[in-house]
Amino acid sequence: MLSLYEGFFSGGARIVHSDVLLGLVEGGRQRHRVLSLHSEVHRETTAQHMRDDPCYRSLTGAGIDITSLGRTAPLTDGTLAASAFTGPELADTARALAGADVILSLKEQPLALLNQAGLPRRPIVVCLHRSDPENQGPALDALRTAIADGKVVACVCCADSTRDAYAAAGIPADLLHVIPNGVDLLRFRPDPVARLAFRRSLGIPATAPVVVFAARYAPMKNVPLFLRAARTWLAREPTGHVVMCGAGMTEANGALRAEVTDRVHLLGVRRDMEAVYAGSDVVALTSSSGEAAPLCLIEGMMCDAVPVTTDVGDSASIVAGHGIVTPADPAAIVTAWSAAVTHRAHYTATLPRARERFSRTRMIASYAALLDTVTTETRDELRPGLSG
């Protein structure tokens, strides 16, 4: 199996896909490699090098070979930096494809490369992680082209909202398979020791209410809405604290510098999100579009942080019975945060019975079954030769 990544940078889709690869390799029945189009990307006001990325390190640490075409360019949502590829890039890609039985494309952006003429023809499984295909620039057209050419044999949707959105965009329904996101339940769990240690590291009292916002600094996340709600909530909650983490959530971001106080903590990208969530009372999401199955809601909820989210993607069904869905209104969000803090014990009481639904094990088993089926059904159909 060969996975194509647009690049290694902070984001839930890369975390999920990398975790799936780790699980499939652990199973021992499949061999996986990764080809990354970019070795460094510039987005969310940060330069993110492949070799510094936690997903890259986890994959290589597990023995998964990762190569790159070496591109370095700014990226915007849904847009590959260029759809023109050099001769050496195509040659490197051809060598990588030649050794694979099945190609996994992390989102539709890498299809701009896979649609190039003369590359080895292999069955492609496209892993979709958004609910707004129309906002993916030329990537949606690249997906349509690959499907029309007969190379795409399945699309994995991480949420029902993803399936519905792509079906509405004209993607054949029989290609769309829903495999909901899952997380490592041994890692993401309530942890009183980690809770106290995290709070102590930031000077937050043990009894103070804490809201965490785990997101990259991007328009779809509606950071301004979160900040308006945070200012009002902090004014009402004199002991409250707000934690913001993710790519671009640092004082180096001029748009956030003025927000910093002794009760607003900008942490940037963290590798210990289980501790961040365990140390929080509420995990907030204020996104306006694009979300499918937000990883922050699942991870936070599994650590006993009450999810409070706008109604985007599958968020409402994910938090049903365990959190609060709000309109995109600061006053409503503030009220919901306070209610979540006050009634936290109520919202977390039924979580033990719901944990299996969000299991990484369940997710990986579903991917393995689909890939086994694809391999069996297409082994000879799309491999007429290296120049297909």
Report the location of each language-model feature.
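Conserved acidic donor-binding segment of nucleotide-sugar-dependent glycosyltransferases
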Residues: 321-331, 339-344
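A short helix/loop element that forms part of the nucleotide-sugar donor recognition site in Leloir-type
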Residues: 52-54, 189-204, 348-349
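Carbohydrate-associated surface elements
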Residues: 161, 182
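Short His-centered aromatic/hydrophobic patch
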Residues: 105-111, 128
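Short hydrophobic beta-strand element within catalytic cores of glycosyltransferases
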Residues: 305-309
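Nucleotide-activated donor-binding/catalytic signature segment of Leloir-type glycosyltransferases, i.e.
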Residues: 65-66, 253-270
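A conserved mid-protein helix/loop that constitutes part of the nucleotide-sugar donor-binding site
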Residues: 14-22, 209, 213-232, 365
